Amino acid sequence: MPKMKTNRAAAKRFKRTGTGKFMRARANKSHILTKKSPQRKRRLRQGTAVDAINVRALEHMLPYL
């Protein structure tokens, strides 16, 4: 059986933690930042875990991560 390919687009966007969760960056942090409060921009800097509903799809896209 041939090796499975890693989806390179997903590999650049998601990282796996030591406990096996997938982490992602938050949206809305690239432009139009003047109207967003400093607290909101600070929260957007931190990553967050991927929802459980999407984990199975990510495991197929990232078999070796």
From Swiss-Prot:
One of its GO terms (cellular component) is cytosolic large ribosomal subunit. It comes from the Bacteria. Gene3D superfamilies: 4.10.410.60. SUPFAM superfamilies: L35p-like. Keywords: Ribonucleoprotein, Ribosomal protein. One of its GO terms (molecular function) is structural constituent of ribosome. Pfam families: Ribosomal_L35p. InterPro entries: Ribosomal_bL35, Ribosomal_bL35-like, Ribosomal_bL35_CS, Ribosomal_bL35_sf. One of its GO terms (biological process) is translation. The keyword Ribonucleoprotein applies. PANTHER family: 54S RIBOSOMAL PROTEIN BL35M, LARGE RIBOSOMAL SUBUNIT PROTEIN BL35M. NCBIfam families: rpmI_bact. Belongs to the bacterial ribosomal protein bL35 family. This is Large ribosomal subunit protein bL35. It comes from Syntrophobacter fumaroxidans (strain DSM 10017 / MPOB).
